[in-house]
Design a protein with these regions (language model features):
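Alpha/beta-hydrolase fold nucleophile elbow
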Residues: 197-208
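N-terminal secretory signal peptides that target proteins for export/translocation
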Residues: 1-14
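Glycine-rich nucleophile elbow surrounding the catalytic serine of serine-hydrolase chemistry
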Residues: 207-217
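Short beta-strand/loop motif that positions the catalytic acidic residue
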Residues: 417-419
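A catalytic-pocket lid/entrance helix-loop region that shapes and gates access to the active site
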Residues: 217-219, 224-327, 454, 468-472
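Conserved alpha/beta-hydrolase "acid-adjacent" motif
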Residues: 425-429
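Catalytic-loop region of hydrolases
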Residues: 36-120, 134-137, 269, 282-287, ...
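Cap/lid segment of the alpha/beta-hydrolase catalytic domain
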Residues: 119, 128-196, 243-244, 251-254, ...
Length: 535
């Protein structure tokens, strides 16, 4: 039987210090709402955009500073922009392009400043995991929201994924995120010159991939850069992230008999729900707390002919391994998080391929074996020597796992962490990091500075893939702004389902390690009928 237990002892200390539930307001700040304490007055430019071309920035050359008319911006092609059509909804803004010399690289970055209606924020745009392009698409969203923004290519351009490592291994140092740190400082300087006053709030709000990695790097290494930050489904353990993806692939590809076709995943999911859905008092197709779910896929062992409602013995073995914590074959050290009961409908992207997930392939090809011709079929990865190669000193710069957030906390910084139990990047990594922060910084200090919400049924970055998928229905930046300006932390959040033809549901989610519990009466789709309790 497999019972997944995250470490919760330190987090329980936080729960005991939480204010009484009756005194806590439920946070339900809808996307697009702009009503919160400390909301910023809108500001217009005080000088011309072109004037900024003459601003002196350390080790930096400003190559252009031009006003872009409303609706006229056409993004460059490629990953950062992805389209050649104009973004007609963009407001008028000042576009500054510049290059900074650092780390033996020409780091390109852009700063976008709304010409009117600036909300007082500087909100950096997160990078792709390997850099390579300025994140225009993310900057588009942020400027549309009224923020000044900055994005950088991290000094890595012209390469696919991490292939740059073969020719320029020194550029791995760029993934320590010094380029973003420098760009944020320059953005604040330019915003101050343009508007005649400095930014009132600096915040990042990113999900998955490189963006959430950037958030974690910022709060760990440069605590003065941001007043607040939001990291959703963050991937701060780059060296082990790829290893975990190979673990899932290998579990179901050790032989043709171990492969689990996607047609069988609904049966595994249904069996997991039968085992654990009712633990919170509500049968709603979602497991509230998978960490306390006793589920063995062996209950699905075929008793007769193989079919999509049962598993063969090798498939049972494969499913059990997917739920297991990946471990070093020799030292038995845990490597990464594991998949949770209830997540089965989201396995296909990891196990339904002939080769491992693309991130894992590129990671092993360029950072583990340094062989551009490597394929998994020709040389399957192992969990002994290959783990040691993955964690070679030169690769560790991409990890941002330091739990010592005392610098950020002591400045009054606020960090909101969100994970999804159904994420195919196992949420246990998020939980483990949070627990380490609590242990390092102290439960009392963390209570006032860091919150973790783990959302039942939530896929990666709020993705909704089936009727049991929940999304977070609130403005995270507004939440951390309110927290920063009033001291009121988000003690509860509300999630919902919204897929066409799906049952409309809204549920209460509590700060980890608390869980939502049905009070016993009233609609189970009304969050008012749930309360937060410690398991």
């Amino acid at each position: 039987m497999y019972k997944i237990r995250p470490h919760i002892s330190s987090a329980l200390k936080i729960h005991r210090m939480l204010v009484p539930l009756a005194a806590v307001a439920v946070l339900i700040i809808l996307i697009g709402a702009r009503v919160w304490p400390g909301a910023q007055a809108q500001t217009a430019a005080s000088i011309s955009c072109e004037t900024l071309a003459s601003v002196s920035l350390p080790n930096t050359a400003i190559t252009s500073a031009q006003k872009v008319a409303a609706g006229a911006f056409v993004p460059p092609g490629g990953r950062g922009g992805a389209t050649a059509a104009p973004w007609t909804e963009l407001p008028e803004f000042c576009r500054i392009a510049a290059t900074t010399k650092m780390l033996n690289s020409d780091v390109k970055f852009e700063v976008w400043l709304p010409a009117r209606g600036w909300n007082g924020d500087v909100q950096p745009a997160g990078s792709s995991f390997w850099g390579g392009a300025i994140p225009f698409a993310r900057m588009r969203t942020l400027v549309n929201g009224g923020a000044a923004t900055v994005g950088t290519n991290l000094g890595i351009e012209g390469f696919a994924g991490p292939s740059f490592v073969l020719e320029h291994p020194e550029k791995l140092e760029n993934l320590k995120m010094d380029p973003l740190h420098a760009a944020i400082g320059h953005a604040k300087t330019l915003a101050t010159r343009f508007y005649g006053s400095g930014p009132r709030f600096s915040v990042m709000d990113e999900c998955g991939g490189g963006g959430s990695r950037d958030v974690m790097a910022e709060v760990q290494r440069w605590p003065a850069d941001l007043d607040a930050a939001v990291a959703v489904n963050f991937t701060n353990y780059g060296t082990r992230h790829g290893i975990s993806q190979v673990w899932m692939h290998q579990a179901t590809h050790r032989s043709p008999a171990h492969f689990i076709p996607s047609e069988k995943l609904p049966a595994i999911h249904a069996a997991a729900l039968d085992a654990c859905d009712l633990r919170d008092g509500v049968k709603d197709g979602v497991i509230e707390d998978p960490s306390r779910c006793n589920f063995d896929p062996g209950v699905l062992l075929c008793k007769g002919a193989d079919n999509n409602k049962c598993l063969t013995a090798p498939q049972v073995d494969a499913a059990r391994r997917v739920y297991e914590t990946p471990r070093h074959a020799r030292t038995k050290e845990p490597i990464y998080g594991h998949m949770s009961p209830g997540s089965e409908l989201d396995w296909a992207s990891m196990i339904g391929r002939d080769e491992p997930y693309p991130y894992a392939q590129s990671f092993y090809r360029y950072l583990v074996y340094r062989d551009p011709n490597w394929t998994y079929a020709a040389r399957p990865a192992n969990f002994d020597g290959d783990v040691d190669l993955a964690e070679a000193p030169q690769n560790l710069v991409m990890n941002h796992t330091n739990p010592d957030l005392s610098g950020f906390v002591s400045r009054g910084g606020k960090l909101l962490l969100v994970g999804g139990w159904n994420d195919n990047l196992p949420v246990q990594n998020v939980i483990t990091y949070y627990e380490r922060v609590v242990a390092k910084v102290s439960a009392d200090k963390v209570r006032n500075a860091v919150r973790l919400f783990v959302v039942p049924g939530m896929h990666h970055c709020f993705g909704e893939t089936h009727p049991g998928s929940y999304k977070v229905d609130f403005d995270a930046v507004a939440a951390v702004r309110q927290w920063k300006t009033t001291g009121r932390a988000p003690e509860q959040i509300v999630v919902s389902t919204s897929g066409e033809g799906w049952p409309a549901r809204r549920r209460l989610v509590c700060p980890y390690p608390q869980v939502s519990k049905y009070k016993g009466s009233g609609s189970t789709d009304d969050p008012a009928n749930f309360t937060c309790r410690t398991p």
